């Protein structure tokens, strides 16, 4: 996997966003939406009027690093 962005020390920003939402018990839209890339679920926001992009993530995103997700959640819960 190639990591495109670094957010708060986490190379993979999709993993960081999923972990952050789960660690903070945030309500997440489209969590089961089958997306193939980062922009797929951004385009699907049109179906949810008024929903911010940051509230929309997908566990199907190809950039999601499942192996580091648990570690990221634990670290974010300690913040």
Report each predicted region and the residues it spans.
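Compact alpha-helical subdomains of small soluble proteins
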Residues: 4, 40-79
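Short, exposed beta-strand "edge-strand" segments with a Pro/Gly-rich flavor and a Y/T-containing core
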Residues: 19, 33-35, 58-64
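N-terminal acidic leader/helix
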Residues: 2-33
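Generic structural signal for hydrophobic core residues of well-folded globular domains
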Residues: 22-26, 35, 48, 73-76
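An amphipathic alpha-helix signature
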Residues: 15, 19, 35-46
